[in-house]
Swiss-Prot record:
Protein family: Belongs to the Toll-like receptor family.
Gene that specifies this protein: TLR4
Stated consequence of mutating N526A: Abolishes LPS-response and prevents the cell surface expression
Ranges of the Cytoplasmic topological domain: 653-839
One Pfam family this sequence matches: TIR
Signals that turn on the gene: By LPS in plasmacytoid dendritic cells.
Effect ascribed to mutating H456A: Partially diminishes NF-kappa-B activation induced by Ni(2+). Strongly reduces NF-kappa-B activation induced by Ni(2+). Suppresses NF-kappa-B activation induced by Ni(2+)
Subunit and interaction comment: Belongs to the lipopolysaccharide (LPS) receptor, a multi-protein complex containing at least CD14, LY96 and TLR4. Binding to bacterial LPS leads to homodimerization. Interacts with LY96 via the extracellular domain. Interacts with MYD88. Interacts (via TIR domains) with TIRAP. Interacts with TICAM2. Interacts with NOX4. Interacts with CNPY3. Interacts with HSP90B1. The interaction with both CNPY3 and HSP90B1 is required for proper folding in the endoplasmic reticulum. Interacts with MAP3K21; this interaction leads to negative regulation of TLR4 signaling. (Microbial infection) In case of infection, interacts with uropathogenic E.coli protein TcpC.
PROSITE patterns membership: LRR, TIR
Protein name: Toll-like receptor 4
Tissues/organs with expression: Highly expressed in placenta, spleen and peripheral blood leukocytes. Detected in monocytes, macrophages, dendritic cells and several types of T-cells. Expressed in pancreatic cancer cells but not in normal pancreatic cells (at protein level).
Length: 839
C-alpha cells in the first residue's frame, strides 16, 4: 500500500497544476454556428473566455458567475453583435467595459444585481439598438448612463424599482427610440413635468408600456399634445374609480394604438361598467384594444360610444352577455373579437368594415348572416360554428371578399359554389366538417383563388371535377381526407399553376399514372402517412419543377419494376423515412439505389429495415447484404440448365430420328407392306418410273415399292410420311445416287434417316444404286455417303443389254433376301417433295 507521504507527494503537484488551468478550458462552449455563434451558458465561468475566435458575432454567457466587468472585458470579440449576460451575478460594470464592441446591436443584462454602474459603462456601443436591463435593481432612469446611445431603438427596464416616470433630459438624444418598457415597476403617479422632454423633442414612433405599475393618479394635461405610437396600460388600476380618473388624465393624447385591460388570472378590478371608458372621448385614437376583462358586459354598444371613429377595434377575452347590433354608426375598418364569450352570434352591419377577425370565441354556435359590403378579410376560425348553407355573397353581405377562414368549426354544408365571391384568393376550411363536397363543382367560380385548405374536413373524393375552376390555385392542402377505393384519380387537370400539394394522411394505396401530368409548376408534394407499399416513380415524370417529395410514414418495401428513372432532375429532397423496407436479396437493386442517392434523401440515416426479422431496425446505409447462394446449389442449377439445354438441342436436331425410334417401338413386330422404300431425286423420276418400277413391280417375282407420288397420305407432313409410310412399312431402302441426289437437301435428309433406320432395325437394309458416275469432289461433300460407297457393295446402272441383265438380276437377289414369297409384292417412294411440288 502507498504510504501517506508518497500519496501526498503525488496529489499536491496535481492539484497545483489543476488550479492553474482556467475553468473555461475544461468546459468548451457549444459552437452553434462555426466561428459565428457560441453558447457558453452555465459553464461556471468566472471571467470572459478568450479561447473563442475573433469572428464571433453571437455570444451567450448567461448563468455564469462573472460578477465583475472591467474595462475592455470583450476586446477579443470586435465583431460581436449580440451579447447575452443574463443572470451572471454582475454587481459592478466599470468604465469602458464594452469599449471595443462598436458592432454590438443587442445587449442583455437581465437578472443582474447591479450595484455600481460607472458613467462610462456603456461607452463604445455606437451601434447598440436593443438594451435589456430587466431586474437589475434600477431605481431611476435619471442615473442610467445611456444618453449617448443615439442608435438605441428598444429600452427594456421592466421589473425594476423605478418610482418616477420622469423621463430624463437625455431622452432628447434618443431620437431613434421606438419602444420603452417600464412595466412592473413602482410608478404610481404621472405629472406634467415628467413628460416635458416629449414636448420638446417628440418621439412619434415611441411605444410605451406602463403595465403592472400600481398607478393611482395621472395629472390632467400630462399627455396633452403628446403623440405616441402605442400606449399599454394593463393591470394598473385597483378600482373602477382610479381607472376612470387616470383615463381622464390622458386627455389630449394622440396615440395610434391604445391597449387597456388586465392579464389572465391577474385581475385587480372588482367591477367594470361603461363609465370607465368615458374619458376616451378626449383622446385621439387610431386603434383600440381591450383585453382580459372577466366581467359580464351588458350594454357593450354604449360602452364604446367614444370609440366610434377608431379604425381598428379589438376585444380579447371579454365576456359579453348581450350584444345589440353593431350598426352602421361605427366607422371601424378592422374589428377583432378573440376568445370572447357571447350569448349569441352578433349581428354585424358595418358598411366601412374591411377586416373581421372573429376567432376562438364561445357561445352563439349558429352563424347568422352579416351585412358587411366593404369586407375583404374574414376570419371565423375556431368558433365551433355551423353553416346550414355555404357559401355565397348573401352569407357575408359582400362581393369584395378576398380572404375567408372557416377552419376549426362545426358542420358546413356546401350548398353554393361561391356565387358573388369570385374575388376570393385565400380559402381555409381545415378541421371543419364539410358536407356535399363531392356532389358538384363547389369551386367552379373561384378562378382567382390562390390558396385552398380542406385538410381533415371528412371529405371523401368521389367526383373527378371537385377542383374544376381553380385555374389560378397555387397551394392546395387536403391532408386527412379519403378517396374512393383509396385510389387517386385525375382530379388536378385544371390546376396548372399549383406549386404546393399536400395529400398526406389520405389512406391512399394507388394513384393514376397520369394523376400529376398537368402539374408542371409543382414544387412541393407531400404523400406522407399513406398506405403505399412500393415507390412508383412513373406518375412524377412530368413534374419538371418538383423540388421536394415526401413519402415518409408509408409502408414502402421497394420500388416498382420500372426502377427510379422517372424522378425529375429538379428533385432536391426526397423523404422516405419510417417505411417498411424489405432488406432482402430480391430488393437489392433498390437498396443499392438508396445508398447511391444519399445526397438526395432526407434523413437517410433514419431509414431502417423492417424485414426480415434478423435485420429489423438496422439502418439501410449500414446494410451489407450478401446475395450469394450456396456453391452446391449454384453448381446443381448450372448443371441442370446445361443438361436441359443439351437435351433440348439434341431433341431439336434429332427430332425425326426420335420419331423413327418411336415408330420402330410401335410397329416393330408388324408386317412390312412394301419390299423397298425408294429414295431418289425428282430429277431422276423418269428413270425410276420407266426402269425401276416397271422391271420390279411387273417382273417375276413382283416387288412392291413405296413411292412418294403414289403412296404418301395427303394432308400429312412430308417428314411424317417419310418415316411412317416409308421406313416403318418397308423391308429395304433403295437409294438412287446421282449428282442431283447429292445436291438435294431432302434426299440427304432421307438418307440420314435411313441410316438411323438401318441401325435400329439391325439389318443391312440399304441398297445403293449409282445411276450415273458422280464426281469425287462432289461426293466428298457428303462424308458419310462417300465412306459407305467406298466400303460397301453397290449397284451401278449400265445402259447396255448385258449390263441391264446383270443389274436386274443382282437387284432382285438383294430384294429377295429375307423375303417370304408373296405375289402381292412391296412398294417405295421418292425424296424431293418440295422440288417435285414446286415443279
Amino acid at each position: 500500500m502507498m504510504s501517506a507521504s508518497r500519496l501526498a507527494g503525488t496529489l499536491i503537484p496535481a492539484m497545483a497544476f489543476l488550479s492553474c488551468v482556467r475553468p473555461e478550458s475544461w468546459e468548451p462552449c457549444v459552437e452553434v454556428v462555426p466561428n459565428i455563434t457560441y453558447q457558453c451558458m452555465e459553464l461556471n465561468f468566472y471571467k470572459i473566455p478568450d479561447n473563442l475566435p475573433f469572428s464571433t458575432k453571437n455570444l451567450d454567457l448567461s448563468f455564469n458567475p462573472l460578477r465583475h466587468l472591467g474595462s475592455y472585458s470583450f476586446f477579443s470579440f470586435p465583431e460581436l453583435q449580440v451579447l447575452d449576460l443574463s443572470r451572471c451575478e454582475i454587481q459592478t460594470i466599470e468604465d469602458g467595459a464594452y469599449q471595443s464592441l462598436s458592432h454590438l446591436s443587442t445587449l442583455i443584462l437581465t437578472g443582474n444585481p447591479i450595484q455600481s454602474l460607472a458613467l462610462g459603462a456603456f461607452s463604445g456601443l455606437s451601434s447598440l439598438q436593443k438594451l435589456v436591463a430587466v431586474e437589475t435593481n434600477l431605481a431611476s432612469l435619471e442615473n442610467f448612463p445611456i444618453g449617448h446611445l443615439k442608435t438605441l431603438k428598444e429600452l427594456n427596464v421592466a421589473h425594476n424599482l423605478i418610482q418616477s416616470f420622469k423621463l430624463p433630459e437625455y431622452f432628447s438624444n434618443l431620437t431613434n427610440l421606438e419602444h420603452l418598457d417600464l412595466s412592473s415597476n413602482k410608478i404610481q403617479s404621472i405629472y406634467c413635468t415628467d413628460l416635458r422632454v416629449l414636448h420638446q423633442m417628440p418621439l412619434l414612433n415611441l411605444s410605451l408600456d406602463l403595465s403592472l405599475n400600481p398607478m393611482n393618479f395621472i395629472q390632467p394635461g400630462a399627455f396633452k399634445e403628446i403623440r405616441l405610437h402605442k400606449l399599454t396600460l394593463r393591470n394598473n388600476f385597483d378600482s373602477l374609480n382610479v381607472m376612470k380618473t387616470c383615463i381622464q388624465g390622458l386627455a389630449g393624447l394622440e396615440v395610434h394604438r391604445l391597449v387597456l385591460g388586465e392579464f389572465r388570472n391577474e385581475g385587480n378590478l372588482e367591477k367594470f361598467d361603461k363609465s370607465a371608458l368615458e374619458g376616451l372621448c378626449n383622446l385621439t385614437i387610431e386603434e383600440f384594444r381591450l383585453a382580459y376583462l372577466d366581467y359580464y358586459l351588458d350594454d357593450i354598444i354604449d360602452l364604446f360610444n367614444c370609440l366610434t371613429n377608431v379604425s381598428s377595434f379589438s376585444l380579447v377575452s371579454v365576456t359579453i352577455e348581450r350584444v345589440k347590433d353593431f350598426s352602421y354608426n361605427f366607422g371601424w375598418q378592422h374589428l377583432e373579437l378573440v376568445n370572447c364569450k357571447f350569448g349569441q352570434f352578433p349581428t354585424l352591419k358595418l358598411k366601412s368594415l374591411k377586416r373581421l377577425t372573429f376567432t376562438s370565441n364561445k357561445g352563439g354556435n349558429a352563424f347568422s348572416e352579416v351585412d358587411l359590403p366593404s369586407l375583404e378579410f374574414l376570419d371565423l376560425s375556431r368558433n365551433g360554428l355551423s353553416f346550414k348553407g355555404c357559401c355565397s355573397q348573401s352569407d357575408f353581405g359582400t362581393t369584395s371578399l378576398k380572404y375567408l377562414d372557416l377552419s376549426f368549426n362545426g358542420v358546413i354544408t356546401m350548398s353554393s359554389n361561391f356565387l358573388g365571391l369570385e374575388q376570393l384568393e385565400h380559402l381555409d376550411f381545415q378541421h371543419s366538417n364539410l358536407k356535399q363536397m363531392s356532389e358538384f363543382s363547389v369551386f367552379l367560380s373561384l378562378r382567382n383563388l390562390i390558396y385552398l385548405d380542406i385538410s381533415h374536413t371528412h371529405t371523401r373524393v368521389a367526383f373527378n371535377g371537385i377542383f374544376n375552376g381553380l385555374s389560378s390555385l397555387e397551394v392546395l392542402k387536403m391532408a386527412g381526407n379519403s378517396f374512393q377505393e383509396n385510389f387517386l384519380p385525375d382530379i388536378f387537370t385544371e390546376l396548372r399553376n399549383l406549386t404546393f400539394l399536400d395529400l398526406s394522411q389520405c389512406q391512399l394505396e394507388q394513384l393514376s399514372p397520369t394523376a400529376f401530368n398537368s402539374l408542371s409548376s409543382l414544387q412541393v408534394l407531400n404523400m406522407s402517412h399513406n398506405n403505399f407499399f412500393s415507390l412508383d416513380t412513373f406518375p412524377y415524370k412530368c413534374l419538371n419543377s418538383l423540388q421536394v417529395l415526401d413519402y415518409s410514414l408509408n409502408h414502402i418495401m421497394t420500388s416498382k419494376k420500372q426502377e427510379l428513372q422517372h424522378f425529375p432532375s429538379s428533385l432536391a429532397f426526397l423523404n422516405l423515412t419510417q417505411n417498411d423496407f424489405a432488406c432482402t436479396c430480391e430488393h437489392q437493386s433498390f437498396l443499392q439505389w438508396i445508398k447511391d442517392q444519399r445526397q438526395l434523401l432526407v434523413e437517410v440515416e433514419r431509414m431502417e429495415c423492417a424485414t426480415p426479422s434478423d435485420k429489423q431496425g438496422m439502418p439501410v446505409l449500414s446494410l451489407n447484404i450478401t446475395c450469394q447462394m450456396n456453391k452446391t446449389i449454384i453448381g446443381v442449377s448450372v448443371l441442370s440448365v446445361l443438361v436441359v439445354s443439351v437435351v433440348a438441342v439434341l431433341v431439336y436436331k434429332f427430332y425425326f430420328h426420335l420419331m423413327l425410334l418411336a415408330g420402330c417401338i410401335k410397329y416393330g413386330r408388324g408386317e412390312n407392306i412394301y419390299d423397298a422404300f425408294v429414295i431418289y431425286s425428282s430429277q431422276d423420276e423418269d428413270w425410276v418410273r420407266n426402269e425401276l418400277v416397271k422391271n420390279l413391280e411387273e417382273g417375276v417375282p413382283p416387288f412392291q415399292l413405296c413411292l412418294h407420288y403414289r403412296d404418301f397420305i395427303p394432308g400429312v407432313a412430308i417428314a411424317a410420311n417419310i418415316i411412317h409410310e416409308g421406313f416403318h412399312k418397308s423391308r429395304k431402302v433403295i437409294v438412287v445416287v446421282s449428282q442431283h441426289f447429292i445436291q438435294s437437301r431432302w434426299c440427304i435428309f432421307e438418307y440420314e434417316i435411313a441410316q438411323t433406320w438401318q441401325f435400329l432395325s439391325s439389318r443391312a437394309g440399304i441398297i445403293f444404286i449409282v445411276l450415273q458416275k458422280v464426281e469425287k469432289t462432289l461426293l466428298r461433300q457428303q462424308v458419310e455417303l462417300y465412306r459407305l460407297l467406298s466400303r460397301n457393295t453397290y449397284l451401278e446402272w449400265e445402259d447396255s443389254v448385258l449390263g441391264r441383265h446383270i443389274f436386274w438380276r443382282r437387284l432382285r437377289k438383294a430384294l429377295l433376301d429375307g423375303k417370304s414369297w408373296n405375289p402381292e409384292g412391296t412398294v417405295g417412294t421418292g425424296c424431293n417433295w418440295q422440288e417435285a411440288t414446286s415443279i
